[in-house]
Amino acid sequence: MAQFSESVDVPDMGRRQFMNLLTFGTVTGVALGALYPVVNYFIPPAAGGAGGGTTAKDELGNDVSVSKFLESHNVGDRTLVQGLKGDPTYIVVESKEAITDYGINAVCTHLGCVVPWNAAENKFKCPCHGSQYDATGKVVRGPAPKSLALSHAKTENDKIVLTSWTETDFRTGEEPWWS
């Protein structure tokens, strides 16, 4: 029978082993930090609330306050916000007290360029290939084959909430192509 002493000496960690562990920890931390945004890219965003809507965001990513929005915009103004699926969406000021009940998706139906509002000509004009849309987003001149997509815009707790438009397109009388 072998006798074991109670005080078993554990050898100290050598300098080389310590440096290896330190290097491994550093490389692992940097690699995980670099992989985090890549992994997040492939994870879909969380679903909207019970209403399925998306709160409109300004250019800084803050929720758009309806009262402040109406104070700083004139009747008839069309202003870009971040809307459904992160798409740029125009909010239209209907009166000093209200916005229209719809938002206009600013992505051109031809090749996907963002279509700016031209207030002087009272229409949207695509800078890529010249497509033109009227004040409601209905296509009036190609090469764009379809009108700009719509979304419902409503006010909840002083915020603009955008929801999917699934009803008949009031501009064309047809079923919406985007739903």
From Swiss-Prot:
Q: What are its GO cellular component terms?
A: plasma membrane-derived thylakoid membrane
Q: Which UniProt keywords apply?
A: 2Fe-2S, Disulfide bond, Electron transport, Iron, Iron-sulfur, Membrane, Metal-binding, Thylakoid, Translocase, Transmembrane, Transmembrane helix, Transport
What SUPFAM superfamilies does the record tag this protein with? ISP domain (SSF50022)
Q: What class of enzyme is it?
A: translocase
An example Gene Ontology biological process: photosynthesis
Recorded hits in InterPro entries, A to Z, give: Cyt_b6_f_Rieske, Rieske_2Fe-2S, Rieske_2Fe-2S_sf, Rieske_Fe-S_prot, Rieske_Fe-S_prot_C
Which cysteines form disulfides?
113-128
* Purpose: Component of the cytochrome b6-f complex, which mediates electron transfer between photosystem II (PSII) and photosystem I (PSI), cyclic electron flow around PSI, and state transitions.
Q: How does it assemble?
A: The 4 large subunits of the cytochrome b6-f complex are cytochrome b6, subunit IV (17 kDa polypeptide, PetD), cytochrome f and the Rieske protein, while the 4 small subunits are PetG, PetL, PetM and PetN. The complex functions as a dimer.
The UniProt record's further free-text remark is: The Rieske iron-sulfur protein is a high potential 2Fe-2S protein.
Q: How is this protein named in the record?
A: Cytochrome b6-f complex iron-sulfur subunit 1
Protein source organism: Nostoc sp. (strain PCC 7120 / SAG 25.82 / UTEX 2576)
